[in-house]
């Protein structure tokens, strides 16, 4: 590569140098250079022993989002390689990614393809979004593929119209029996009954919007939708040291 680079004209070399300097500018920071100088995480071990790895970045500053993208890319590549070449295609310890603020973090290239092949390797993700509009903005053409590759869909509430419509359609329709009675008065009074079956959305988009905040809707592949109370997180006992770390 260096030989190819050096074969260019002086103007081309200067342009490459400027582009490279701009790309690597953040690595001039001593703290970032120190963080990325050596590998201390042993990423493949996540698929071999129980481990919790937290990646915390400020939600109001995207300057270092690329680090999380690098971390995700390295994790998926190394875990897939470990599963395929050491354990016959499936990791001994399941690895679950909780991808909070999914829309605000840089993602690996071809994430939709990664999502479609991870299950057999004992890798899974929870994609957490404010609404489906965020997913459509990130993956204009592949968003339906991403939703389709998720076996579970949990709706906690929201105020975005396209999400309400999607959830309403996902719920499907209910069958309604309708009885209509008619009676005419007079000399030859008649009495009639009309019976018909019709369909109605289980919840209309407006009813989805007005869903009681205590409830959530859960969709599991191959099962009927479930409406249930959300779990009260205040019931979980958190020890004082853990509370302080949070």
Which residues does each predicted region cover?
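P-loop NTPase motor core of the ASCE superfamily
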Residues: 51, 113-116, 134-235, 239, ...
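Acidic, glycine-rich active-site loops and adjacent beta-strand->loop/helix elements
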Residues: 103, 131-133
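P-loop NTPase motor domains
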Residues: 1-123, 138, 206-227, 236-239, ...
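Structural recognition of the conserved hydrophobic beta-strand(s) that form the central parallel beta-sheet
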Residues: 124-129
